[in-house]
Regions:
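Membrane engagement elements in two modes
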Residues: 72-75, 150, 175-177
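Carbohydrate-binding surface patches
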Residues: 94-148
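Aromatic- and carboxylate-lined catalytic core of secreted/periplasmic carbohydrate-active enzymes
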Residues: 51-112
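Beta-strand-rich binding/interaction modules
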Residues: 140-162
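C-terminal beta-strand-rich structural cap/linker in extracellular carbohydrate-active enzymes
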Residues: 162-184
Length: 184
C-alpha cells in the first residue's frame, strides 16, 4: 500500500549483534544508515547503548554514552530534515574515496563500482538536497562527491571539509557525514 514503508534494521533477536560481528566502526555507520536510507528505522533493544549480548537483559549500568549520544543526534537530524524521511527521494551521486592520508591515490567509485567501505548518496525533497556519506571502515575516509556542498556536517555540527594537495574539496567522514547540497 501507499502508506507502507520498509523497516530498516541492523539487529534483531535472531542474529548476533552487528557490533560483535563487524566492530564498533562498522556498527556506527550501519546505525547511521538506518536513519538516512528510506524506510522506518528500528533500534533493537540496547543497540542504542552499544549492547553486545543477543538476548541478555539490557545492561543499562554499562551503557556506552558515546553510542547513545550518536543515536540521539541521528534521530534529531532525521526529525529536522524531512528529506531523510519516508517522503525523501534517494539518488546516486558520483564520488572518489581516499582513506587516511590525503596523498593516497583515490579509489574511483561511480555507477555500479563502489569501494567496499564507503558509499555516498543523495536524499532530497522539495525543500532541500542532502548528501550522505557512510564509511564502514575502521579509519576515517576523505570523499570527494560529484556535487557542490556545504562544509558543515549536520550530525556533528562541525566542519567536515578538507582540501587535498590538488585543491579538491573532500568530505572527511568517520562513520557518517550529512551535508547540504549547495543551491544553484
Amino acid at each position: 500500500p501507499d502508506h507502507a514503508e520498509f523497516l530498516q534494521y541492523i539487529e534483531n533477536h535472531d542474529e548476533t549483534r552487528y557490533r560483535v560481528e563487524c566492530g564498533d566502526d562498522a556498527a556506527a555507520a550501519a546505525g547511521a544508515a538506518i536513519f538516512t536510507l528510506p524506510g522506518v528505522p528500528m533500534i533493537y533493544a540496547g543497540q542504542e547503548i552499544g549492547q553486545r549480548g543477543r538476548r541478555d537483559a539490557i545492561a543499562w549500568d554499562h551503557a556506552r554514552e558515546g553510542v547513545r549520544d550518536r543515536y540521539e543526534r541521528l534521530i534529531a537530524v532525521r526529525e529536522d530534515h524531512p528529506a531523510l524521511g519516508p517522503e525523501g527521494n534517494l539518488d546516486r551521486v558520483g564520488y572518489h574515496v581516499a582513506s587516511g592520508d590525503l596523498s593516497e591515490r583515490p579509489i574511483v567509485a561511480s555507477g555500479d563500482v563502489h569501494p567496499d567501505d564507503v558509499v555516498a548518496f543523495r536524499r532530497s525533497d522539495e525543500d532541500e538536497q542532502l548528501v550522505v556519506v557512510l564509511n564502514f571502515a575502521p579509519e576515517s575516509a576523505s570523499v570527494a562527491v560529484g556535487v557542490d556542498h556545504a562544509d558543515r556536517d549536520l550530525v556533528t555540527d562541525e566542519s567536515c571539509v578538507v582540501v587535498d594537495g590538488e585543491g579538491t574539496e573532500r568530505i572527511r567522514v568517520d562513520d557518517v557525514a550529512v551535508v547540504r547540497e549547495a543551491e544553484e
